[in-house]
Amino acid sequence: MPKRICHHCGQPLEIPESAIGENFNCPNCGKDILMPPAHVAQREKIKLTVLPPPVENYSASQLAQLARLIIANVQTVIVGKEPQVTLAIAGLFAEGHILFEDVPGVAKTMLSRAIAQSIGCTFKRIQCTPDLQPENVIGDFILDPTTGRPDFRFGPLFAQMVLVDEINRASPRTQAAMLEAMGEGMVSMDKVSYRLEKPFMVMATQNPIEQEGTFRLPEAQMDRFLLRLSLGYPDAAEEKKMCERIQTQHPIETIQAVSNAA
C-alpha cells in the first residue's frame, strides 16, 4: 500500500489503493485528508488539500465570551500581561500573525504554547539560524526506498500554530519562504500547492537589542504581521506569583483545551 505522512499529526500512513485520491480518515488523529501518491501529484500537479474544519456562525457576544474563556485559560500559565494576551487572541480571531520584539526569557514561547493548547491546535517551534534553509521550514521531497519515488515530507510550517524564534537570524531566502504561507495560507513546492490547515498563525520573535549576525526584515515581510507586541519583564509581584505556580508542576504541562480549532 502507498505510504504517506499525515501533516496533522506527523504519523506515517498506509493508504489502501481504493482510497487514493479520495478523502482518507487518518487512524491516528481522526482528521480527513486528501492524499494522492507523490508521483501522481508531481506528474499531474494534483493539489493536496486539507478539508477545512466545520464553521459555525457565532454572534458577537458568543465570540467575546469565547475570547474571554481563552484569555482566562492562557493566564493560568502567563502571569499578568493581560493587554498583550488579549491582543494576541484578537490577532488569532482576525487570522493575523504576530511579531514579538523583546529580549529573551519573557515567556514568548510559553504564550504561543498556551494559546495553541487552549484551542487544541498543533504547535511547532522553528529556531532560526543563518544556515537554516527553506527546506528545513517548508519540507522537502525525499526518496522513499520502498517505492523508489520521491515523497514530500512536511516541515514544521505545516503546524497550525508556528513559533518562529529569532526570525531575523534566518537568511532573506528563508524568510521569503514563509511569505506565501503567511499571506495565502498555502505552500508551493515543485509546482505543487499544499494548503495549510486553519487556523494558521505565525508568532515570530526578534531581539531588538542584539543586531549582530541578523538580517533586517524587509517591508514585505513586516506587512504580513497584523500585530507587533512586546511582553516586557515581570514586576516583583508577578515574579513571586510565577515562583508559587511552579512549585509542584509547570502549568503549561496541565493546561487543558477550552475550545477547538473550529
Segments from the language model and where they lie:
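Cys/His-rich metal-coordination motifs, chiefly Zn-binding "fingers/knuckles"
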Residues: 1-47
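Pre-Walker A (pre-P-loop) alpha-helix and adjacent loop at the N terminus of AAA/AAA+ ATPase modules
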Residues: 61-98, 103-106
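Short loop/turn elements that form and flank the Walker-type P-loop nucleotide-binding site
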Residues: 86, 93-95, 106, 119, ...
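Conserved alpha-helical scaffold flanking the Walker A/P-loop in AAA+ ATPase domains
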Residues: 87-90, 143-163
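Walker A/P-loop
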Residues: 93-129
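Conserved NTP-binding/hydrolysis module of P-loop NTPases
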Residues: 132-148
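Canonical AAA+ ATPase core
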Residues: 144-149, 170-174, 182-259
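Walker B catalytic acidic pair
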Residues: 165-166, 177
